[in-house]
Amino acid sequence: MVTLYLHVPILLLVVITARAAPKPDTHNPFDELSSVAEKQDLHYGDRSRKDPFIAQNDVGNNFRDGTQENLTKVRSKVNQYDQPFTFKCPLGETIKSIGSIHDNHYEDRQWDIDCKPAGYTMGISTWSPYANDYDGSMNFECNEGSVVTGMSSIHDNYYEDRRYQLMCSYLNNWKRGSCAWTSYTTYDASFVELTPTGKFLVGMKSQHNNYYEDRKFKMLYC
């Protein structure tokens, strides 16, 4: 008996898929936070607030704004994690918004600060001494007639904390009038504070927590 072996060629089809080069990461978390406010038209923070910044709703980020007219995109960070920074508003401008994002890997915050025209003739500007020690509390206010126009900070990896200096600028013919503190922000949470219409940022309080290795902040607006 003759056995025939039939060799059938096997065709292998190799499909090569061309992949486009990955797009650069342009995600900006500050823009994401700001877009929430713009879309939902809300005031953010704790429902229990009893000041001119009373919140109507929560979004879980302790993200707050002053008034709808003041809503603005917080555009870019002013520091890298673990790195020092110094920020000053341009001459004749004051703080329009101040925002921050916390990172649990670095145990540090990135800050964003935006400015607006002061509407007053500006006099002398001075930097404060450091307003806090590492792991210590902060309770700072500019002198009467002056408003916050800058922030400087250094970070320490041993304490996983920052020390802060604030710059105050004198506004000619401006007096404080009515003032109000915001409520504290939340440890490990992002926040954006927008200066209410007709007000200025004049003070800041802060407390550090070693469990969270983070600070919570409250702002004084007049």
From Swiss-Prot:
Residues 1-20 form the signal peptide. Sequence repeats lie at residues 100-109, 153-162, 206-215. Residues 21-75 form a propeptide. It is found in: Secreted; Nematocyst. Its main location: secreted. Is not glycosylated. GO terms for biological process: collagen fibril organization. Keywords: Disulfide bond, Nematocyst, Repeat, Secreted, Signal. One of its GO terms (cellular component) is nematocyst. It comes from the Eukaryota. Disulfide bonds join 89-115, 142-168, 179-222. Is potently cytotoxic (EC(50) value 79 ng/mL) towards L1210 mouse leukemia cells, has hemagglutination activity on sheep erythrocytes, and is lethal in crayfish. Has no phospholipase A2 activity. Belongs to the dermatopontin family. This is Millepora cytotoxin-1.
